[in-house]
């Protein structure tokens, strides 16, 4: 890289001038080798990788260079390129002239913009991290080894061996930097960060993460991350493959910053100046001017491309959806520039009036969801509830599909239930293109106001997916799946008075029960009560804070039962009078209290935050029981394991109820468990540190996963036993 230097001559009439000089000293070498860099690990990774890229450019070698990321099996950071290599003179010079590795500001790349380097500092960057590293050169039939080290007089280089290249040896340079164990993860992160612009250039060994490689692009690359992104929002220059922030230079409002959260902009080599550390740009007047002009040019280009694309769009709905996803600033920028959209030349306000759901759509019909327990929902301009379908969710711009059913026959609830059953059958030919939990808008053909709204709905969803079926058509397809209701002579309830949950084929299934009060004796076993959407105990004192059938299933699994009932108000009094059912809340409370009483106070295992992520998994998987010795001095009892599993299963389950209620009893047990675990955690952090140090691979693997597969559990057990042997 050509480094631009500006010269300005100031004339005077004084005495003879004298040149400045720098005295070579350990202090100077320390400044140039270590103090120059703020992020020392990134400096080592960046400089050695870019040197390899330059080496391959030097002899036009398209082969991939090799990076070895340090780890427990090989604690070295290794960079091996397949460039031309270097001669002994190139590396260490002679008595009259120093080489590239034992001199500063000496570079072979300063006269060309074809290379990334140019300051003559990068090859010495390992000294910012370590006092010694090795160099091996494969050049003109010889392999020469060197060790570079720092002593009291500054950096030194010493030859270690010379031998002939073998038939399989290739020219190039190999740099080996020893790495401390505590820095393994940092080196891995920096490799994944620095390599993003260099896709398909390297073979990377030992890296435990994916690299978010940049795609191929000519001018700029915009990103709106939906997950963690290593660069904070703003503008970044990519110069010589290195990413530099340039937000501080740009003051004016620009489309790139509005359009994308993060923007990477390529700059031609030679157009910017960089600091010697290459950690930042050198923001002189020329560099600032080039940055401002480049951002302005690309911002205008990007804006014109977006405007052109929007104007050529034939779908107002898709265009409006994209504008809504852009956010307020982008929409405001376009409106302020009087942009018109689509081939219909629509304004933003016109599209807004076209696609924001009107209140009249609340009269379009009723809604059911495709599941085994379909419930009627009325359409309202409000938030979603168990009885309300929000018009914004049903018709809004982010909805890309609508299923319309012409309600031409009776029995829609059973037909929807039959459809849900059919969709569970892998052999069912789903020509309807309707899927589980999708919404069905039922339009009554005899209600003129609903039929009149059908063209408006179809116009709203132009270019999106609109499925229209007659209910009779759906019935014909799912007839064999529709549940048969055996009618009793007595009048049946209009809605389910109970729900039965039972395990079939290894999974929980829910079935509606339409029972009269006189038939309440058919219900036996474990029950919970339900009123509206609330779920509570038989005595009525305790309810779930966040009512969910899944929580009841979790409670049933803890108790160890394979069926239970949820009773609605019509049957509750009679079921209680019969006395043949047990409350599932009470059963859980009794089991929980018994499990707590079975564990002696001195048998608790410390649950510090650092140990928790390991202990939770060890308790969950019996095959890993032997590992508990690394986190607890005492042997973990079966009673403690049982209690800890119950506590873990009840995480996130909260109960309403005052003192002397089932919910309060359950809360008390959980609270006491936490207190006793915290009291036992005084040695926990120390044991975790020892485990992490001794078993780094297993620690990293197990510590950052929410769950483990059976194969992973077996592999961990096998690895631990081998390492501990």
Swiss-Prot record:
SUPFAM superfamilies tied to this protein = ATPase domain of HSP90 chaperone/DNA topoisomerase II/histidine kinase (SSF55874)
Annotated InterPro entries: HATPase_C_sf
Question: What switches on its expression?
Answer: Expressed in the early phase of the viral replicative cycle. rIIA RNA is translationally repressed by the regA protein.
Q: Which GO terms describe its biological process?
A: DNA replication
- Gene Ontology terms, cellular component aspect? host cell plasma membrane; membrane
Q: Where in the cell is it found?
A: Host cell inner membrane
What positions belong to coiled-coil segments?
A: none
Q: What are the protein's GO molecular function terms?
A: DNA binding
Question: Is Iron there in the keyword field?
Answer: no
Q: Is Secreted set as a keyword in this record?
A: no
What does the UniProt function comment say about this protein?
May play a role in viral replication since found in complexes carrying several of the enzymes synthesizing deoxyribonucleotides and associated with DNA and host membrane. May be required for maintaining membrane integrity during the process.
* Name of the featured protein: Protein rIIA
Q: Which gene encodes it?
A: rIIA
